[in-house]
Amino acid sequence: MLKTLVQLFLVVAGFAPGFGYDKYTTHIQNGNPYNLTVDMTPFIKINESYYVFGQTKVNWYVAYENCRRLQSELVTFETAEEFDAIAAFLNARGDRSEHWTSGNDLGKTGTHYWFSNAQLVTIKRWAPKQPDNAGGREHCIHLGYIYGYSTEFQLNDRPCHNHASSLFKYICEAPKQETVSIVVWK
């Protein structure tokens, strides 16, 4: 998509008076291969991704909206390593709060997907006997120390809306960085 937009811009700009180029090429690389300084405030880099840890306790929908305002998404744990890195970061800060993720089964009860990328939730970090859709109303996934005896962060399903026991902090994940190079021959 980004490459198409850049190419479209160059084509349109090529018709502007005094801005005609004979030849150009674009190249898009994942990440920041030249370690350019990029201000990612308020995001925090953990491994190769950037996150914001929302401090207000809100329902899942408000958490999603807050992340979108930052042009990011609720966190999606694509690997167990990513989950473990976030859990380690929170533990290092002494933060045992519960946090919303993008996971839910709003589309089909019992089948949990990451809302951000439409992939099945496959990581094995559920709390014991979870997800359970207690009362037929738990559809959004959060992470936290789920039970009083829990010794680590785990996943659990909770009601998405303003249920008194379902107002949590949230974690936003920035989109993956891409570096766009444009070479123009005049």
Curated annotation (Swiss-Prot):
Keywords from the named record: Calcium, Disulfide bond, Glycoprotein, Hemagglutinin, Lectin, Metal-binding, Secreted, Signal
C-type lectin domain residues: 46-169
CDD domains: CLECT
Cysteines joined through disulfide linkages: C140-C160
Compartment(s) where it occurs, according to its Swiss-Prot or TrEMBL record: Secreted
Keyword Electron transport found: no
GO cellular component: external side of plasma membrane; extracellular region
GO biological process entries: calcium-dependent cell-cell adhesion via plasma membrane cell adhesion molecules; encapsulation of foreign target; immune response; melanization defense response
Molecular function via GO: carbohydrate binding; galactose binding; metal ion binding; pattern recognition receptor activity
Residues bearing glycans: N35, N47
Keyword Disulfide bond: yes
Span of the signal peptide: 1-20
Role noted for this protein: Galactose-specific lectin that displays calcium-dependent activity. Binds to the surface of hemocytes and enhances hemocyte encapsulation and melanization. This is likely by interacting with carbohydrates on the surface of the hemocytes. Also displays agglutination activity against the Gram-negative bacterium E.coli.
Entry protein name: C-type lectin 37Da
Gene: lectin-37Da
